[in-house]
């Protein structure tokens, strides 16, 4: 969790990932754990999760009122109700868990942030996080190419701000995949800073070992053109881009390649450069970065420090995490904390 992780310590300590799994299995949703400790319903259907929650609501005789909340009603420093399009709903406790501004087709359009701001809360700038990245053309050239087990370094101007290992994919607009989505969470200053990526295509090999590998391939293909000498080392689709980046004439015979040229190729293989134009729109982001300032919320109960009886949960808060189910766990843990505290309101 790259931002405001400490705020979540209390909520996570009382309801963690194991508690979440036990909860849903108790609701009749069998789960499975896949690569990377990612947990899914055995059915692979997200619908089974929402259906199980709805069954629990009905069992607990919870009333579901389908209306669009317009504003909070606040009296004497505390919540007194919610005003909707169809009328007023009196309440001594209200939980705002309206999500972020990603995926607006789901109804998550940022109205909760507006209501929080009207109640006096600070809402930090809203941006897309876990979002694909646009580049200046390499992605379109390599569209459809997926690279597994590569290293990634993100540079903000010339300063290294993030490094990781995993899988990425080139698309018609740029880059995506788990590695790129997590990296995007650290790229928050587009317009103020320049970002570029360095992809280590052979992270399992240090430069000396990779150089020996190149020498072996060059000996094998010594009479070939350079552009035809990398087939054992790289995916076919990637080779023209590597040749271009190396600066070596694609028709140069391998036996004529100098030691200095080979060292340049080695640098490209360990630091293949991609200049980033910017993120894709926030509507394409998996989660929203930014939200209600956590310093204005009690971390144990999720209650507002400014308005009595007002609670927050999930993506409306200024907390977001990497891909891998962490953002869902934030929703479960903060939702439970807010729900228990709100239920105890007089």
Regions found by a protein language model. Give the residues of each.
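Flavin (FAD/FMN) cofactor-binding core of flavoprotein oxidoreductases
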Residues: 39-46, 129-138, 279-296
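Short hydrophobic core segments
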Residues: 65, 69, 82, 88-108, ...
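A glycine-rich dinucleotide-binding beta-alpha-beta segment and adjacent secondary-structure elements
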Residues: 65-71, 240-320
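Conserved beta-strand-loop-beta-strand element in the redox core of flavoprotein oxidoreductases
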Residues: 71-94, 148-158
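A conserved FAD-binding loop/helix module that cradles the flavin
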Residues: 93, 100-119, 318-346
């Amino acid at each position: 969790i790259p931002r405001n992780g400490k705020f979540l310590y209390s909520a996570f300590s009382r309801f963690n990932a194991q508690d979440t799994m036990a909860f849903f299995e108790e609701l009749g949703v069998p789960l499975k754990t896949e690569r990377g400790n990612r947990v899914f319903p055995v059915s692979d259907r997200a619908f089974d999760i929402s259906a199980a929650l709805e069954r629990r609501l009905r069992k607990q005789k919870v009333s579901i009122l389908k209306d669009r909340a317009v504003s909070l009603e606040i009296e004497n420093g505390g919540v007194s109700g919610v005003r909707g399009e169809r009328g007023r709903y009196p309440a001594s406790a209200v939980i705002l868990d309206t999500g972020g501004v990603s995926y607006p087709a789901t109804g998550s359009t940022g109205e909760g942030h507006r209501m929080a701001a009207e109640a006096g809360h600070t809402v930090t700038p809203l941006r897309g996080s876990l979002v694909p990245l646009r580049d200046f053309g390499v992605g379109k050239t390599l569209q459809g190419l997926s690279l597994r087990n590569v290293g990634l370094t993100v540079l903000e101007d010339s300063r290294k701000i993030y490094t990781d290992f995993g899988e990425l994919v080139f698309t018609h607009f740029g880059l995506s995949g788990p590695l790129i989505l997590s990296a995007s969470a650290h790229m928050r200053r587009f317009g103020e800073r320049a970002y570029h990526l360095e992809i280590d295509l052979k992270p399992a090999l240090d430069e000396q070992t990779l150089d020996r590998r190149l020498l072996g391939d060059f000996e094998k293909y010594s009479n070939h053109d350079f552009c035809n000498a990398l087939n054992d080392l790289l995916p076919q689709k990637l080779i023209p881009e590597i040749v271009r980046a190396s600066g070596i004439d694609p028709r140069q015979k391998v036996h004529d390649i100098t030691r200095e040229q080979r060292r340049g190729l080695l640098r490209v293989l360990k630091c293949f450069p991609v200049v980033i134009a910017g993120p894709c729109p926030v509507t394409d982001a998996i989660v929203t970065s930014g939200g209600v300032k956590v310093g204005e919320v009690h971390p144990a109960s999720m209650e507002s420090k400014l308005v009595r009886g007002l609670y927050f949960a999930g993506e409306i808060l200024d907390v977001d995490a990497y891909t891998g189910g962490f953002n869902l766990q934030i929703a479960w843990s903060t939702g439970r904390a807010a729900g228990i505290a709100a239920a105890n309101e007089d």
